């Protein structure tokens, strides 16, 4: 086994939490149960990693075996990467009812190898999702196993979740996907997150949907608190009930998908009644700025704003629409053909 391959396997093992090492190695499937029992997993982790490499050398592990281990690791710890959603559209005329995984892999490989043969390409099925791993190389260098691209495709859906895709490789990757999946177009959605499962929940509409109501506020009867003790002072109970109702109506009551960031790009022109109002109005270039919101769990944070008294209820649709529009990056511009002294935000 080449030295660089042994080093790659060792580094992959060292990235594993010590308590999960055995679980990941079993999921890998390259080493048998009896082989795993021949040594003791112990600190420091370097000792365990060296022992695993020794077993791999004895079994003549190849780069495909190492790539399979990397796939298992990244599937188990997918939240260590930032994922972007791509959406395919306009299915081709060929039948797209039944998904043939073997045919998909064959067509994908053909598309990639037609342009570049110096790549490491591997597939692994995890439940309903087909994981694709590509390590890209050049004419002069071997494929970089440490900067591989990962794509997750659910058959018979137009969505692909991709991480680690450089601009130079994007056209080839997208072309291979649409050919293998029998679509004709693909585009990047404005939706990103470290939580792969939350991205799936959003595009597959698996998250808790807000309930519909025919009333903008709760019934009057629901707003009247029961007086248990006349000496108790109820402060703003009606307002609290109204905020609670609007929050449930907007976000629902169940858990929300986990996103970490939302960005809003503003592009507008300065308006004035006359050119004497300032030099900025005479500039043809629009004014641009970016506002970003970040949180370990952004949607839950937004849902808590009104009940906490930080924001008015209902929350602005610019924030509440994120899961329903399946995007967390927005561009706010002006409507065309409006009166030169007024503006209105659109395109969100």
From Swiss-Prot:
The keyword Hydrolase does not apply. GO terms for biological process: CENP-A containing chromatin assembly; chromosome segregation. Disulfide bonds: none annotated. InterPro entries: CENP-NAC/CAD_complex, Chl4/mis15/CENP-N. Keywords: Centromere, Chromosome, Nucleus. GO terms for cellular component: chromosome, centromeric region; nucleoplasm. It is found in: Nucleus; Chromosome, Centromere. Probable component of a centromeric complex involved in assembly of kinetochore proteins, mitotic progression and chromosome segregation. Belongs to the CENP-N/CHL4 family. This is Centromere protein N-A. The gene is cenpn-a.
């Amino acid at each position: 086994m080449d030295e660089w391959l042994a080093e790659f396997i060792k580094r992959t093992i060292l990235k594993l939490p010590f308590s999960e090492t055995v679980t990941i190695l079993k999921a890998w499937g390259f080493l048998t149960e009896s082989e795993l029992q021949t040594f003791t997993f112990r600190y420091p982790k370097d000792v365990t990693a060296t022992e695993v490499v020794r077993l791999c050398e004895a079994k003549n592990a190849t780069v495909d075996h190492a790539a399979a281990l990397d796939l298992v690791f990244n599937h188990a710890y997918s939240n260590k990467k930032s994922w972007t959603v791509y959406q395919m559209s306009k299915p081709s005329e060929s039948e797209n009812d039944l998904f043939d995984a073997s045919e998909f892999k064959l067509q994908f490989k053909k598309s990639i190898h037609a342009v570049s043969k110096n790549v490491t390409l591997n597939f692994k099925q995890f439940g309903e999702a087909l994981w694709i791993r590509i390590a890209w190389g050049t004419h002069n260098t071997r494929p970089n196993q440490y900067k591989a691209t990962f794509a997750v495709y659910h058959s018979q859906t137009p969505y692909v979740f991709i991480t680690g895709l450089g601009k130079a490789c994007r056209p080839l990757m997208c072309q291979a996907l649409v050919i293998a999946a029998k679509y004709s177009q693909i585009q990047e959605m404005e939706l990103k997150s470290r939580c792969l499962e939350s991205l799936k929940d959003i595009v597959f509409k698996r998250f808790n949907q807000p309930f519909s109501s025919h009333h903008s506020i709760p019934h009057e009867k629901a707003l009247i608190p029961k007086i248990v003790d006349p000496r108790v002072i109820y402060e703003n109970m009606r307002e609290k009930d109204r905020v609670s109702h609007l929050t449930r109506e907007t976000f629902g009551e169940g858990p929300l998908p986990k996103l970490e960031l939302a960005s809003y790009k503003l592009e507008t022109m300065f308006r004035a009644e006359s050119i004497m109002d300032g030099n900025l109005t005479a500039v043809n270039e629009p004014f641009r700025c970016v506002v970003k919101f970040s949180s370990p769990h952004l949607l839950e944070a937004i849902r808590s704003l009104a009940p906490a008294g930080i924001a008015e209820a209902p929350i602005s649709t610019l924030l509440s629409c994120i899961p329903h529009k399946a995007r967390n990056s927005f561009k706010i511009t002006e409507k065309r053909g409006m009166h030169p002294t007024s503006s209105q935000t659109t395109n969100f």
